[in-house]
């Protein structure tokens, strides 16, 4: 009889432990291991960090292309690096770091239906794990509205802005090849940036775009509109590394000493 109760106790403890770990380990299982915690003393930030993840393409469209031209074989191209960046910021500034994550929801809803996976719940599990603010967006103007009015900008300035998603030299392509093959139906164009209230940013705010070609024109319009430089790619970017997108050679970052110039 003691053997029976002993094994029953072990089973109960296992169930409790599983329940405790499920909420914290869910996003790790989906998106990979956590980054190592920094041993460096955390710094204080008086501002807010904004991270934007654009939408993913649908495979039903991309499978019609030649393989070398296909996009988004994995649905999480713009989610995984954003999650890694959230970890980096919390390692650097501590758990009280103000982070708001803007994600284009319609693309992930349709890709969720296509893949038969609960992508929305998985994305929300990142919010829950790191205790950040998640704002679902449906239009390009939602980004500007949040920059200007998401917080009381007289009290909480923007310390950093990062974009992960499709783009061209003139626009963030918030939706791409999801509703129509090879077409963007939702975007934030560089000419719209004049609507940004430049006083929303800290003077030394760090802004980065990991979208293709945004270092060729849009980054210049960003600086003119906000007063803050944007690090961006001249040429295409590659999301093969799930932790940090890179620029495809012979392209380069617009703040690099050797800048690739597009042939005309």
Which residue ranges define each predicted feature?
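A domain-level signal for caspase-like cysteine endopeptidase catalytic cores
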Residues: 33-143
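Caspase-like cysteine protease fold
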Residues: 232-264
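A general structural motif
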Residues: 45-47, 96-99, 153-158, 202-204
């Amino acid at each position: 009889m003691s053997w029976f109760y002993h094994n029953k106790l072990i089973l109960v403890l296992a169930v409790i432990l599983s329940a405790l770990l499920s909420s914290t380990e869910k996003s790790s299982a989906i998106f990979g291991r956590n980054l190592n915690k920094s041993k460096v003393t955390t710094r204080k930030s008086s501002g807010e960090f904004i991270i934007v993840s654009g939408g993913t393409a649908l495979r039903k469209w991309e499978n019609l292309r030649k393989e070398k031209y296909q996009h988004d074989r994995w649905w999480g191209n713009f989610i995984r690096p954003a999650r890694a960046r959230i970890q980096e910021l919390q390692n650097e500034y501590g758990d009280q770091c103000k982070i708001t994550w803007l994600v284009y929801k319609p693309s992930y809803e349709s890709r969720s239906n296509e893949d038969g996976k609960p992508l929305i719940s998985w994305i929300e599990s990142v919010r829950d794990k790191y205790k950040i603010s998640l704002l679902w967006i449906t239009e390009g103007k939602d980004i500007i509205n949040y920059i200007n009015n998401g917080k009381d900008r007289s009290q909480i300035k923007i310390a950093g802005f990062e974009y992960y998603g499709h783009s061209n030299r003139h626009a963030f392509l918030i939706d791409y090849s999801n509703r129509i093959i090879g077409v963007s139906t939702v975007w934030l164009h560089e000419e719209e940036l004049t609507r940004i209230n430049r006083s929303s940013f800290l003077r030394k705010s760090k802004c980065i775009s990991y979208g293709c070609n945004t270092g060729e024109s849009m980054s210049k319009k960003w600086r003119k509109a906000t007063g803050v430089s944007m690090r961006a790619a001249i040429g295409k970017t590659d999301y093969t590394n799930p932790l940090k997108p890179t620029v495809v050679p012979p392209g380069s970052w617009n703040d690099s000493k050797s800048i690739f110039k597009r042939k005309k």
